[in-house]
Amino acid sequence: MADSERLSAPGCWLACTSFSRTKKGILLFAEIILCLVILICFSASTTSAYSSLSVIEMICAAVLLVFYTCDLHSKISFINWPWTDFFRSLIATILYLITSIVVLVEGRGSSRVVAGILGLLATLLFGYDAYITFPLKQQRHTAAPTDPTDGP
């Protein structure tokens, strides 16, 4: 390995890990972990019919985490990433809420009840993600100058 490659490796590592320290990075990582735990709970139950939601949301969150971590979202400009992330988290919020209510009403088996309760927690987590990534909320307008610009 050349000296220039060795010197650029820490910078590359720093660039790749800097997103994981942000609020959005921690939130995406928490979504992946929570989806994995819900998937395990649904798989441990007698019927794993609801596990597909956890798999799909875990994959979507992991893809977005990789795109944001590697800064690929700035290189692929034909996708509107804030709206994509907002709709992903909004749809996940709605689907986890419906699935959790159905699972808790059925209430067969302790692992399904735990998965339903964790699904409600995932509803809150994805809802918070949708709230902080709402694109229109992030647009800031500069205040109009009130002082004349041509002197006193």
Swiss-Prot record:
InterPro entries: Marvel, MARVEL-CKLF_proteins. Its main location: membrane. One of its GO terms (cellular component) is plasma membrane. It is found in: Membrane. Keywords: Membrane, Transmembrane, Transmembrane helix. It is a multi-pass membrane protein. GO terms for molecular function: chemokine binding. The chain crosses the membrane at residues 25-45, 48-68, 85-105, 112-132. It comes from the Eukaryota. Residues 19-138 form the MARVEL domain. May play a role in cell differentiation in the intestinal epithelium. This is Proteolipid protein 2.
